Amino acid sequence: DYSSGLNLFSNFKNVVITRTFSKIYGLAGLRVGWGYASKDIINALSRIKPPFNVGRPALFAASAAIRDSAWLNKEIKHVNKWNEILFKEFNKMKIIKNKSFTNFILINFDKLKIKSHKVFRLLANSGILVRKMDVYGIKNSLRITIGKSMENKKLIFRMRRILNV
């Protein structure tokens, strides 16, 4: 189950919890987020942060996103639905994957004869962009962002063809 971590923040003075608008809010390019911390930590961070560190358009977009709870709830349902579908589909394909509570899923090809770099190339040739994880020390794996329903269906179709299942 998902844990916000707020219990850690409530029980310890040295805990900082950060959140981003990049994932569920879909505002990755704006680099906007927020955090929870004790007043002492917030004061220390405020002394070293640059002035005007977030532009007005980004603040406006983040503010609008936070107020639109109907859209957020719809997006959460979409991500949860597709997390479950992709988890089951990748399981059928014998791909190693972790249960995810985010808008992306990590898949590993160690139990298959095909390597992640080849799958990456074949998906890219089909217009499906995923992220290689080798640069993060996670070998033979890809990170797949949950997209729109049609994009996810295309991914499943293409993965079945690549793996001949």
Give residue spans per PLM region.
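Active-site pre-lysine segment of PLP-dependent enzymes
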Residues: 1-24
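Active-site PLP-lysine loop of aminotransferase-like
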Residues: 16-28, 45-56, 134-135
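Short acidic/glycine-enriched loop/turn segments that link adjacent beta-strands
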Residues: 29, 101, 137-140
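Short beta-strand-to-turn element immediately C-terminal to the catalytic PLP-Schiff-base lysine
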Residues: 32-39, 107
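Short helix-loop capping/hinge motifs at secondary-structure junctions, enriched
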Residues: 39-44, 112
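Conserved PLP-dependent catalytic core of the aminotransferase class-I/II
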Residues: 43, 63, 67-97, 119
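Conserved PLP-binding catalytic core of the aspartate aminotransferase-like
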Residues: 80, 84, 92-126, 142, ...
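PLP-dependent enzyme catalytic core of the Aspartate aminotransferase-like
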Residues: 122-131, 135-165
